[in-house]
Swiss-Prot record:
Keywords linked to the UniProt accession: Antibiotic, Antimicrobial, Fungicide, Signal
Keyword Signal found: yes
Name of the molecule in the record: Ixosin-B
Compositionally skewed regions (Basic and acidic residues) per UniProt: 76-89
Signal peptide: 1-26
Keyword DNA repair: no
């Protein structure tokens, strides 16, 4: 379950996208640095990737983050981020 701050970031990304993204748009990325808010005494870089599937009126929000001590998930692109949360709006 996402923390309160994480839930707010996901909702903010979704609301911003609702106002600015046409139905068939590609992914948009939001970069946020949130020191101490998601994890005490930590500086975590997070990226919310918001997609608006052409099939209909909902947004998919994936929140990725990097920080030491978390085993990264390897992607085919070689990116080593950790997906923290996923929500649909």
């Amino acid at each position: 379950m996402a923390s309160g701050w994480t839930h707010r970031l996901l909702l903010l990304a979704a609301v911003v996208t609702l106002g600015a993204t046409p139905i068939a748009a590609a992914s948009m990325e939001y970069l946020v640095t949130a020191p101490g808010y998601l994890t005490p005494n930590a500086d975590i870089k997070i990226t919310a990737v918001v997609t608006n599937p052409s099939s209909a009126g909902q947004l998919k929000v994936d929140l990725w983050g990097t920080r030491s001590g978390i085993q990264p998930e390897q992607h085919s692109s070689g990116k080593s981020d950790v997906r923290r949360w996923r929500s649909r709006y």
